[in-house]
Amino acid sequence: MTQDTSTYYVWIGGSCDYGHKERAGGAAVVIEHNGNIISRDVISDLHTTEFRMMQTLMLKVMQEIPEGSDILFLTNAAYIQNFDKTPTAKSAESRGRKARANPDLIIQCIEEKKRHNSVGVKIVQYHKSPLLIETHDRATEAMAKTRKEFHQKNNRLSVSSEIVASVSMPPCAQEGEDGTENSSHLSR
């Protein structure tokens, strides 16, 4: 692909682990300008999807790139092509589905797009785009890290709760050496 030196090319990919109950989602970008990689970014969160994370990161990129710029997002996720289409009940009906997901982010993207000369999305082939592959790999790593930190934090909280419960247990509720409840202090 021949690049225009004035355009910001933003490779964007995402990942989500639908198989886990805490469902982590992540997105990453690699930004090229004037033939050079100028920035990389990655985000992740729990109880979300890769699409929400990708739209969140699109919004962040549009906010950070200088006003009046030309921005082209390059991805294999057709979902984000509608980042600037106002969600309506009629658009949902015509597709026989519920209303478009993430309307809050779409509205913000529409507003942020106004700051720039042009903002578009181009679908590219995943296996032919090393920088797109990188974004998916980085999004997957960030998502896995977020999930791991969540479980480590919950395990620490669980252990802390058990320690507090055993330390604060009144003597009458503690067991004696023979396994029966020790209530000798009550008979005094």
Residue ranges and their predicted role:
Residues 1-52, 63-64, 137, 145-147, ...:
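RNase H-like nuclease fold core
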Residues 15-21, 41, 58-136:
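RNase H catalytic domain
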Residues 24-25, 99-100, 160:
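Glycine-rich, flexible loop segments associated with nucleotide phosphate handling
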Residues 44-50, 67-68, 107-112, 155-163:
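Low-complexity, flexible helical/coil segments
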Residues 50-55, 102:
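Short, charged, low-complexity patches
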Residues 53, 57, 131-143, 149:
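Stable alpha-helical structural segments in soluble proteins, enriched in small hydrophobic residues
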Residues 102, 141-164:
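Acidic, His- and aromatic-enriched active-site or binding-groove loops in soluble protein domains
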Residues 128-133, 156-169:
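Amphipathic alpha-helical surface "interface" segments used
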